[in-house]
Amino acid sequence: ESVVIPDPKRITLCISTQVGCPLDCQFCATGLMGYKRNLSSAEIMDQFLMVSRDYGKNKISNIVYMGMGEPLLNYANTLKTLQIFAEEKTKDISLRRITVSTAGIAPKIIELADSGLKVKLALSLHSMFEETRNKIMPINKKYSLKENLEAVRYYAKQTDTPITFEYVMLKDINDRTDDLNELLKLCKSLP
């Protein structure tokens, strides 16, 4: 699955890295279909090539690894495609216009930081409280919010790239004043 997000100033391509998703985030429809398999690097690149054919190669200005699946659970193939985009002959899209979105796989965030590929990173945050995050994002039980925040701070320092936080507001779950205050504290603590 890939999705084109048109905007008057840019065209963003949202690409998938897995068929389904194993994370079972409680607010995400993809989790309902279960996990089938990782996409190969060729299948990931094919999404870009097919949309480029339809829109024109130079029309796609941004890529987000934010479709179906968790990119950092398919790290080898995600990394391989990022390396392809980094090659001189595919420099149509700058790495600074590529964002990898993750639910929070802390060791892989650090690996990506050390890869030398300075792509943008987005953390699907959705709560600043471990207990709430455990309920709505079961992956938090394996890689805690604390671990992930340390990893994204490391990423920002290593890559000199700002971090994006994604936050779906869920009524009576993560929409309280305390949630907002903690989120503001986090944002103020980062460069």
Task: Place the predicted regions along the sequence by residue.
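N-terminal [4Fe-4S]-dependent radical SAM core
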Residues: 1-17, 44-58
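A broadly tuned preference for mixed-charge, low-complexity surface segments
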Residues: 35-54, 118-121
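Canonical Radical SAM [4Fe-4S] cluster-binding loop centered on the CxxxCxxC motif
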Residues: 7-43
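Conserved AdoMet/S-adenosylmethionine-binding subsite of the radical SAM
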Residues: 52-62, 67-191
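Short, well-ordered turn and helix-capping elements at secondary-structure junctions
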Residues: 4-6, 32, 69, 104
